[in-house]
């Protein structure tokens, strides 16, 4: 009560934030009349002035009003788009490192240009992050025109670019790209052997579009770079064959003499918990599996892998559905994104689950991969100096954004009032009744011409609904993961009169639905693509036709049919000698294509305008949801496709008690309400109690998913600190910063490690583990300890350690004299990197194994999280010790042969490698002598034995 009164008097936090920004909007508006008078050159010159002021120490914050005003003026001149006042506020929110919640159709893409331009002035780099390659390319081409006009450079990162192209794109003032590409580039950079090969710069400022999708929906999916293992795939087929023989059971509560008066009993061979997405064998099931696989004890430590793969096979059969969670295409299992409905080729479930599903579907089983590098989006984006984001739906997840990313959400008011009524949910008892009602409403609205966007939560449901519409002869488009190539094209026209579009979840997100149709989209359909794409096609066809050596007339005629109106351009570029400047031709063809395309856009504008008015009169775009998603935010995103920029529209959800959400999380409560109200089969109910019960079910799931993500980040934070240590160490090595000192430090720490392991404090030296000491010193440093009885009586742990250190330093000085400073520094650098990378890879595998079994610690009354932190730390310290020892050992033993001895290396390589292994194995017990130089030899053009990846003549053979 008191809180509500305070809120009424001083306003909510959001209102106070907006109130603070309106005076700045006024200042920006006051600058507009002066900027309108400037020529294009003078407006562009403002950027150079801003850069000069920034270099003199002026802050970006103080330049914000002027920079935003300049960017707005450029938008008017280049794109014919003027930023609204509320968009200026959105830009300020982003610049301040917060999340701007802006409703669909309010121009988020245009808003991003404001903070991008302002922060681009610093030259430190701005990353504009989108969810897919299409949007990254579209936005860099479209909005990038504003930045280029103002003199800033623009790059785009999409799949398939070479390293030099990526480096160039990251060097730009503003770089557009996808979250996946940014994350993988970071991991790839930290696996490289040369700082000059890095593509990314230090992380400065990021604007994340669809921030909820990337930072929340994707948060449970770590980015992983992996390499294949050699394990056999037969085990997956063997286990998969027994799963259909197991009977699914239930968990039943029976009366018992316990505190609660009840106990759980299990039927069948396994039970399934759909909330936790887990499947568990019962006692009967364990016995049956042991019998079928002919093993004595499934829980024997030697059979833990069999148990693990059996549980994953159970999950594959009981919890993962084809055309819902994945599709099978060309004998390959491809994951479907549960939030967008898009296919995710290249992504794989970990922990053997993907292989279990491949076995279930009879698809080719790919080997399990070993992790080489990994990071979660949560930890990747927390590395930016300043992070901001925008979306249509963030307020429901405001708590999570603040707790995990320290990001506040500011809700931006709409430019025009929202006119879309969201009708109450309609609930039926069965899915069949629900679909009959959905078809009835679609038919009714379609007959009067109102466009309808139907939202489904899976490919399976969208195709089922499509079949029902076909039976009613209702024309429609289906947009799901199987048609994602046409996604933007179909969604852009979903607002046309009489259009029925079925879309899986948020497919087509990022594309505006204009009532009456999109003139630009219609022009693309008629033109068979964009001017740039058609020009690229034409140039390829032209070069192919040229290769056929046809006479000039025939050449022009063959192309005229496919590219009408282009031949006069070709003719004008042909010189008298029959030569042609291809670069000039491409520019001329692009100009002609742009002209033709613009004519088509202008032709479609009046058609769309008339249709727009008709659709508005019919009530705008109607959103028809066929099932509630686990998250209210996803439902709000679907609703948000209608009612953009003050357009009319409406939305309604049709549900049934058989829907997953209600069946798993809320059916008892809803079913009880329906029974009390006496709902018969075929009848629907619309009631506030039901709506609240559904919202409560969604809140439960959201809280559950938040806990999972929080749990993940708490575990990954441990790895994140370790990753930072390793990657920082790698960078310092690559930069060559005091590399000799680093090695000397490793060498002295290794001496300390040996002393700690074998020397016992406060005991006579004769009782120390001298066998362990001499073996270790011989193995690592390559010298033999010659200890006299007299020395043994006088030695102490302190002077013994100092003696070892002195001897090791002298031995290293000998190696330095032998190799020379430059070669030794190069060897230290390469060997350090090789050892760190190999040990880090093994460490990641150990961490994976630790994660798999850590949950069982709970049964021993131990906190799994604390146990994980403790054991992960121990594993990390053990790895650091191994790194030190291996680096020191390799430096003390490595040999590079003379140039004359290298020529036989290629022929002898397999045998030589065998010898190297033997030499390494024998080194521990051999007397202090170096391996023969002839044992490591390479030809001038062979890969250098040091492992740098370069040819020997350009590396150690210089």
UniProtKB/Swiss-Prot annotation:
Family named by the database record: Belongs to the SecA family.
Name the record gives this protein: Protein translocase subunit SecA
Catalytic reaction(s) noted: ATP + H2O + cellular proteinSide 1 = ADP + phosphate + cellular proteinSide 2
Any one GO molecular-function label of the UniProt entry: protein-exporting ATPase activity
Compartment annotation: Cell inner membrane; Cytoplasm
Coiled coil, from the record: none
PANTHER family listed in its UniProt record: CHLOROPLAST PROTEIN-TRANSPORTING ATPASE (PTHR30612:SF0), SECA INNER MEMBRANE COMPONENT OF SEC PROTEIN SECRETION SYSTEM (PTHR30612)
Required cofactor(s): Zn(2+)
Domain of life assignment: Bacteria
Start and end residues of each stretch annotated as Disordered: 923-958
Annotated ATP binding sites: 87, 105-109, 512
């Amino acid at each position: 009560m008191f809180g509500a009164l305070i809120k009424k008097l001083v306003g909510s936090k959001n209102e106070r934030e907006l109130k603070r920004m309106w005076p700045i909007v006024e200042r920006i508006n006051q600058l507009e009349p002066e900027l309108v008078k400037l020529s294009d050159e003078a407006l562009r010159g403002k950027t150079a002035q801003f850069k000069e002021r920034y270099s003199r120490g002026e802050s970006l914050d103080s330049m914000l009003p002027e920079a935003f005003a300049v960017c707005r003026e450029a938008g008017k001149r280049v794109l014919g788009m003027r930023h609204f006042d509320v968009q200026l506020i959105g830009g300020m929110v982003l610049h301040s490192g917060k999340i701007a919640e802006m409703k669909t159709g309010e121009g988020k893409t245009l808003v991003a240009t404001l903070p991008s331009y302002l922060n681009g002035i610093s030259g430190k780099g701005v990353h504009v992050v989108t969810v897919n390659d299409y949007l990254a390319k579209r936005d860099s081409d479209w909005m990038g025109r504003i930045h280029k006009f103002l003199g800033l450079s623009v790059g785009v990162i999409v799949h398939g670019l070479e390293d030099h192209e990526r480096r160039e794109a990251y060097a730009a003032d503003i770089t557009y790209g996808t979250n996946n590409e940014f994350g993988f580039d970071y991991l790839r950079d930290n696996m490289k052997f040369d700082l000059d090969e890095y593509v990314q710069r230090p992380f400065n400022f990021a604007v994340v579009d669809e921030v909820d999708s990337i930072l929340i929906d994707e948060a449970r999916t770590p980015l992983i770079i992996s390499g294949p293992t050699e394990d056999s795939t037969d085990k997956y087929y063997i286990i998969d064959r027994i799963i259909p023989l197991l009977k699914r059971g239930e968990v039943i509560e029976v009366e018992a003499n316990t505190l609660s008066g009840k106990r759980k009993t299990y039927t069948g061979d396994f039970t399934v918990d759909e909330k936790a997405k887990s499947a568990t064998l019962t006692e009967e099931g364990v016995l049956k599996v042991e019998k079928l696989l002919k093993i004595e004890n499934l829980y024997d430590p030697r059979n833990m892998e069999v148990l693990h793969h059996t549980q994953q096979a159970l999950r594959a059969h009981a919890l993962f559905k084809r055309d819902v969670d994945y599709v099978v295409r060309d004998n390959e299992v491809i994951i479907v994104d549960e939030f967008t409905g898009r296919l995710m080729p290249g992504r794989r479930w970990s922990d053997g689950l993907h292989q279990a599903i491949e076995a279930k579907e009879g698809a080719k089983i790919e080997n399990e991969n070993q992790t080489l590098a990994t990071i979660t989006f949560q930890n990747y984006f927390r590395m930016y100096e300043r992070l901001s984001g925008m979306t249509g739906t963030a307020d429901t997840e405001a708590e999570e954004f603040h707790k995990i990313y320290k990001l506040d959400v500011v809700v931006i008011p709409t430019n025009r009032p929202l006119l879309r009524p969201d009708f109450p949910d309609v609930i039926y008892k069965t899915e069949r009744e629900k679909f009959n009602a959905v078809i009835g409403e679609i038919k009714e609205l379609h007959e009067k011409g109102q466009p309808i966007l139907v939202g489904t939560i899976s490919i399976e449901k969208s195709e089922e609904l499509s079949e029902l519409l076909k039976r009613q002869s209702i024309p429609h488009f289906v947009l799901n993961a199987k048609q994602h190539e046409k996604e933007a094209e179909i969604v852009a026209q979903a607002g046309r009169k009489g259009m029925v579009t079925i879309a899986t979840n948020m497919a087509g997100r990022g594309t505006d639905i204009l009532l009456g149709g999109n003139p630009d989209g219609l022009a693309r359909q008629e033109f068979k693509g964009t001017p740039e794409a058609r020009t690229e096609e034409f140039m390829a066809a032209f070069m192919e036709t040229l290769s056929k050596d046809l006479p000039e007339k025939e050449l022009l005629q063959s192309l005229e049919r496919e590219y009408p109106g282009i031949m006069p351009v070709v003719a004008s570029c042909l010189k008298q000698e029959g030569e042609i400047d291809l670069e000039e031709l491409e520019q001329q063809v692009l100009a002609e294509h742009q002209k033709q395309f613009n004519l088509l856009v202008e032709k479609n504008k009046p058609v769309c305008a008339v249709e727009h008015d008709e659709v508005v009169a019919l009530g705008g775009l109607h959103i028809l949801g066929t099932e509630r998603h686990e998250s209210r935010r996803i439902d709000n995103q679907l609703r948000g496709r209608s009612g953009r920029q003050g357009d009319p529209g409406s939305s309604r959800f049709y549900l049934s008690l058989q829907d997953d959400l209600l069946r798993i999380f809320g059916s008892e409560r809803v079913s009880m309400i329906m029974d009390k109200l006496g709902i018969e089969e075929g009848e629907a109910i619309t009631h506030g109690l039901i709506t609240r019960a559904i919202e409560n079910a969604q809140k439960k799931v959201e809280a559950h998913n938040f806990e999972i993500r929080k749990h993940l980040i708490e575990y990954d934070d441990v790895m994140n600190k370790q990753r930072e240590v390793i990657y920082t160490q790698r960078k310092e090595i690559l930069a060559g910063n005091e590399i000799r000192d680093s090695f000397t430090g490793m060498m002295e720490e290794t001496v300390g490690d040996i002393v700690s392991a074998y020397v016992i404090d406060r005991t006579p030296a004769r009782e120390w583990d001298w066998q362990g000491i001499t073996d270790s010193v011989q193995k690592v440093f390559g010298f033999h300890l010659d200890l006299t009885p007299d020395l043994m009586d006088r030695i102490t742990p302190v002077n013994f350690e100092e003696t070892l250190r002195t001897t090791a330093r002298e031995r290293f000085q000998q190696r330095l004299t032998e190799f020379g400073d430059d070669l030794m520094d190069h060897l230290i650098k390469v060997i350090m990197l090789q050892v760190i990378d190999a040990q880090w890879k093994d460490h990641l595998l150990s961490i994976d194994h630790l994660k798999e079994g850590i949950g069982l610690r709970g049964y021993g009354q131990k906190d799994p999280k604390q146990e994980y932190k403790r054991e992960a730390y121990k594993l990390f310290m053990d790895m650091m010790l191994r790194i030190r020892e291996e680096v020191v050992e390799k430096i003390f033993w490595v040999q590079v042969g003379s140039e004359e001895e290298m020529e036989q290396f290629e022929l002898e390589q397999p045998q030589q490698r065998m010898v190297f292994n033997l030499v390494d194995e024998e080194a521990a017990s051999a007397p202090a002598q170096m391996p023969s130089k002839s044992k490591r030899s390479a030809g001038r053009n062979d890969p250098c034995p040091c492992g740098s990846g370069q040819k020997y003549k350009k590396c150690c053979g210089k």
